Amino acid sequence: MATQNVVVSESKSGIIAMAVSNSAVFTPSAQKPPTAPGYISISRKKLLKNLDINGGHRINAWVDSMRASSPTHLKSVPSLSADERNSWIMQHPSALDMFEQIIEASRGKQIVMFLDYDGTLSPIVEDPDRAFMSSKMRRTVRKVAKCFPTAIVSGRCRDKVYSFVKLAELYYAGSHGMDIKGPTKGFSKYKKDKQSVLFQPASEFLPLIDEVYKQLVENTKSVPGAKVENNRFCVSVHFRCVDEQKWSELAQRVRSVLKEYPQLRLTQGRKVLEIRPTIKWDKGKALEFLLESLGFGNCNNVFPVYIGDDRTDEDAFKMLRERGQGFGILVSKFPKDTNASYSLQEPAEVMDFLRRLVDWKQMHPRM
């Protein structure tokens, strides 16, 4: 990674604002309007061509993609032969089965933990406002944070994720890493200045996001089960409770709003359509920023571990592969294309893996 100059200033609230320059990842333009370098340039003509609101085949293709990544029934999952499934498992073995090998690879290095929330620390539920983590999981994550620097990286609004997790000692990267804040003052032993890190590379988009959120609420209210969530720096349109026969209508309504906003892009997650600013920023970039903030940006003795279940987590898995450090763990019961090195099937296995990490660290405090 390119060398970075970091300018730090402290506000009255105790939050540290960090401006980073001379970097291939964090450019001075990161806080400028959408036309500045560092943003994805998408012409209005090209955007309309890609969305093709009036083209039925485009809508159908998008719905097929929604269906493929969000199966409602086991029969919706592409069938694999025993050889194909075994091949996938060999390429992405269980992190629990490979625990000793993982520990051996991290020996002599500082482990840094990155955790997605929905589907990783909490089960996927029909109502996104009720995606609560268990008390056992919360206690486990708290123990992990005492052993290693730990961050929650989620597509959710940072404040919403914090209201679920309620642990002041963690780093939180909400809105796919576009809203990053460190531990509450005095709660982290890894930040020597005991202050919080605040980084919001898409702050210029806040008024636009609010405007689009209101339009999406209005345009989708006639689709039963659709839920629009304002995650501050992005908007999520949940279709988990929408009848599959209505997915095409929902996609049409979402796209009819976005055709007026070339500054925003549409991405897809697990039973959710997500609208984000067109900046070169994702969970992988957030991972790099947090490593920089912790002093591990150009360090060979760091071992980042990222655990997540969604498409958006692939950016972080890919970043770890490119860095040649640490590894990613995909949480999924079914084989799927991924840049992760290992796999776990569900949040219960995530908790087992985290507990084993804590037990190992407590037995080897100097390692």
Indicate residue ranges for each PLM-predicted region.
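C-terminal cap/substrate-recognition subdomain and adjoining C-terminal extension
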Residues: M1-K12, D97, K191, F199-F233, ...
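A general structural motif
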Residues: G108-Q110, C147, E169, R232, ...
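Hydrophobic "anchor" residues
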Residues: T120-L121
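Non-catalytic pre-domain segments flanking phosphatase-related domains
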Residues: M1-Y117, E126-P128, K136, E292, ...
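Active-site phosphate-binding/coordination module
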Residues: F132-N231
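Hydrophobic "anchor" residues on beta-strands that sit immediately upstream
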Residues: V112-F114, Y171, V305
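Short coil/turn segments at secondary-structure boundaries
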Residues: E126-P128, F164-K166, K185-G186, E249-Q252, ...
